[in-house]
Amino acid sequence: MTSSGKIRIYELSKDLSLDNKDVLDAARKLAIAAKSHSSSISTLEANQIKDFLKKSKTINSTSKSSNKLDKQILSVKKNPVKTQKDQKTEPKKKNHDQTELSQAKLNTLLKPSQTLIKNQDSSQANNQKALKNKFPAQQQITAPSKPNKPLPPNPRVEVKPTISKPLTQAESTIPQSEQKKDGQFINQPKRSELAKKPTGQPQQINPQEPKRPLAPPSRPKIDIQDKKPLQPNNQKAKTRINQGEISPQKVGQGNIQKIKSQNKQNQPSRTPQPPTKGNTLELVGAPIRREKPVNKPHTNEVRNKPVMPSRPGAPKPPAAANRQGLSNRPGSNNKIGGTGRPGSQNRQGPNRGGVANRTTQGQNRPGGNNRAGAPVRSGSPNRGGIQNRPGVPTRSLGGPNRSNNRPGVPSGMRKPVAPSELMQLQKPQARPNAPQRKTDSPTSPRPKRENSTGARPPVNRPTPAAPKKPAHRPGGTAAAPRRTGRPDWDDSAKLDALRNKSPQKQRQKVHIIGENDDALTAERGGFAGEQQAVVLSASLARPSKPKVGKRNNGKPLTALKKRKKETTRQRQRRRAMELRAAREAKLVRPEMIVVPEDNLTVQELADMLSVESSEIIKSLFFKGITATVTQSLDLATIETVAEEFGVPVLQDDVEEAAKKTVEMIEEGDLKYLIRRPPVVTVMGHVDHGKTSLLDAIRKSRVAAGEAGGITQHIGAYQIETEHDGSTKKLTFLDTPGHEAFTAMRARGTRVTDVAILVVAADDGVRPQTLEAISHARAAKVPIVVAINKIDKEGSSPDRVKQELSEQDLLSEEWGGDVVMVPVSAIKSENIDKLLEMVLLVTEVEDLQANPDRLAKGTVIEAHLDKAKGPVATLLVQNGTLKSGDVVAAGPVLGKVRAMVDENGSRIKEAGPSCPVEALGFSEVPTAGDEFEVYPDEKAARAVVGERATDARAARLAQQMASRRVSLSSMSGQASEGELKELNIILKADAQGSLEAILGSLEQLPKDEVQVRVLLSAPGEITETDIDLAAASGAVIVGFNTSMASGAKRAADANGVDVRDYEVIYKLLEDIQLAMEGLLEPEMIEEALGVAEVRAIFSIGKSAVAGCYVTNGKIQRNCRARVKRGKQIVFEGDLDSLKRNKDDVKDVSTGFECGIGCDRFANWEEGDQIEAFKLVTQRRKLTN
């Protein structure tokens, strides 16, 4: 009890010695809230539950005692027990009476349904008492207490459980009070009792045990639910027995014969035969097989399961309950291979998995012997009533109802029926006693069995209609001669066994009903109206085609589907082969391929070689290179792959970028050509004075304002000079001399008319000088050499001429055709002479253009201005550019809003050879692209759309340049560990600057650290760039650009490192230092001192060396290397260092000390101890 005065359910159940479940059930009935055994209830509620449970116990004990009293009173009338020998001779009489009662029960089916309910109990009692006196031996055996009770079925609402009581032989020998107890069978076990019994350990049965005759003779539990009550004459007999008017012996002999004769009058296909005692004894006598008497272990459990009250229409019990050999059905007791006829004791059918002893159940069902397709056996009784009526449904064990004797249905073949639809149709009468059949029925005779106890005349059957398809037998009709020795419906049993073996197959076929089921409805007209309605609905629900037809139709469909799938695969393979063959036929290998810029992606190389990209990837894989279709290949790898396919590779010349690709003058312009100013490009090595020379020409100070004193853009200027008494215009392009600006120099050369090569007199020819020479030659422009810095000490113009002559640039003074002018940009010496020479060279070139047409030219430089937007430096090469013109520069569309000259003055139009800055582009155009003016925007958009694809491909190639795969640098470090990467977001002021920086980054060593440029674009640094850097862990590098509003605050909030540079030298240097910082530091040795061992002191197991420091100093806990001669005998930590028995940190040169190492004690005099320490050193990037 709880502290609050309440009591828990489990405590109450413990006090009452009951289960918690019983107490909870009582609480629920009394509406007391108790959810589980731990629920608490008050003391008042506990008392209510106690009173309720006491009343329930009193009621139960009273009903049990009354039932027990009735049982005892009725059992007084039982006859003495027969001996085992008498029991074995009894089957003939028992079988006879079973036949009579089976015939009598059939006639009750033809009565209205009201009679069924009223007369059931009386007819059962009548038959029970009649058989009790007829078989006294069995009465005595079945007298013992009620051990094994079958599982009761689920109750139905429409019929009470007591109405449809099965009338079997075992129950006919038991009084009514013994058979029923509170509406339930005495011998019927509860579910809990059945669950407790292990199925694998049943009892062994022998003939003397009292449970043996309890086995019902006719059907398992499936048949019991279909039992029909007897006719009213049996009810009267039962009433008279209960009233004591007649004795059970009279009912057993007289009334059964009356019932048998009455039922024979109702048989549709036979003339009734007067039942005589002699005939009954002769025909009912069943042969007793004793060939293989075996007691099966599971006999009791299976035999008692059929004794279960079922009601018409009740749900069918599962078939597995009775499929353990079906040996315990009535009439098939302990006989292996027996046919299970009523009256044959100690027989048990063989256990077949899933088939459940078809021969036994076929013989044991009422009417089973005489249906179409079943054999007529001499040793089995001829059953009357329902045995030979066409259309009477019979059931296989646990399977669906089948009508086996309908006209037109093949013999030996059962058609499955939906269990829920035709439950009312199948009412096989499993009465133990059925009247004998008339021997003159038109059925074929069946041979006698060897062990038959009496001679039996051949039994004839009515000839059924010819089946539509002879199933499993050579003989197609039921009237064909039966085979001797083996029932010819075994084939049907095998078929049903296959159907019942798998429940899924049974459910799939359960709704397939033959088209002849309508005959069943017509012949079973005696059913009640609700039963006819069920038949009608089942008839309407069935498919129109017979089962055989559906089966035949299903097979071709399945085969067709298989063929279709195979055809689809074959078709796909065939099409793939055809496409491959067509592709190979169309593809023709080129004679050679030209590789631009020394790299191609895998897909581009596959397109050039006219092969599949997978072939390229496979070839690379066999060489140890794992590549994708978008990765770039270097020239060496491309040559190796191309050689496999037999195609030579030609390297695209470096000067290709400097060639003039577009002719600015068209045929329509020839009539309107006038002379135009020349475009002069100043080229040379860095710091050789190009911008200073232009300043001297322009008489301005541009070089002084440049960051770091170097040019990082193309500067376009137009000047006027006096020549031959007239003013001439010259357009100068100043290109960067740094090695990173190769693309800029190439673009400047492509649009130029004359190239001025500036060479410093004190430095001579340098790498960028050679590059400028190659660019000028590729553009096929004349070269004028300006030897600068002649005013400096140590200058040697002749040495410069000598070096240039080695590059095939021979001075006019030395007999060549190249003009060389010594100048001094600082002192403005010989500037006029240089300009005069340039004008003379351009006059020879005869430069012309048409100013009266739409402008065409080249984008020299482009950048994104924070205030103005995209700004492009345009060089007009033909025509005249005006404000408002629609311009298409590569894939970029724009409309000129304003134009500014080199001095910042706004102009409205620009003629040939005039450089201007134009505003109004939708985005920053690419430097080096040609621009053209179109008459309207529609025509310009059409051209821009076509160029967009090429531009995207170019950008992709640029982005994939960092992922280039080569044979020489194959990322072998990837196998050792993950390759370190430095992520960079690059923003610059102009497109040319981006190209220069990206080109320089490509030159950095990438063996251990890879530089990944996530984004490179001209313009200012925005918040979007900050977010990208924060998400990817990148560093933002700005070159001559600024940060947008809010970008600085976002960078501080996200912790993004933003670096801004004005000189490309510093930018590249910092990026290289950052890459080196990602490298693992290396450890190097730093020598400390040397000591010599002069004495050895043993201390326990170890030893200490007495040393003299000869060089440097010895420190405690440093690393020590012990050398004996030239051999190193030990290297490890120096653990102890003492001087005069005191621990010291270090000992300097000239002092003695004691040195001890924990891991070394094998000292010898003369050993040298080298002391050193390991320090980390930053690694450098190496190629």
From Swiss-Prot:
Organism of derivation: Prochlorococcus marinus (strain NATL1A)
PROSITE patterns associated with the record: G_TR_2 (PS51722), IF2 (PS01176)
InterPro entries registered for this protein in UniProt: EF-G-like_DII, IF2_II, IF2_N, P-loop_NTPase, Small_GTP-bd, T_Tr_GTP-bd_dom, TF_IF2_bacterial-like, TIF_IF2
Protein name, entry field: Translation initiation factor IF-2
Domain tr-type G: 675-847
Region (G5): 824-826
Taxon lineage: Bacteria, Bacillati, Cyanobacteriota, Cyanophyceae, Synechococcales
Biased composition regions of type Polar residues, renumbered to the chain: 100-143, 165-177, 231-252, 324-349, 357-367
Location of the region described as G1 in the Swiss-Prot/TrEMBL record: 684-691
Free-text function comment from the UniProt entry: One of the essential components for the initiation of protein synthesis. Protects formylmethionyl-tRNA from spontaneous hydrolysis and promotes its binding to the 30S ribosomal subunits. Also involved in the hydrolysis of GTP during the formation of the 70S ribosomal complex.
This protein's record includes keyword Metal-binding: no
Domain of life: Bacteria
Region feature G3, mapped onto this chain: 734-737
Region of interest called G2, as start-end residue ranges on this chain: 709-713
Gene Ontology CC terms: cytosol
Keyword terms: Cytoplasm, GTP-binding, Initiation factor, Nucleotide-binding, Protein biosynthesis
Subcellular location field: Cytoplasm
Residue sites binding GTP per the record: 684-691, 734-738, 788-791
Region listing for G4, in residue ranges: 788-791
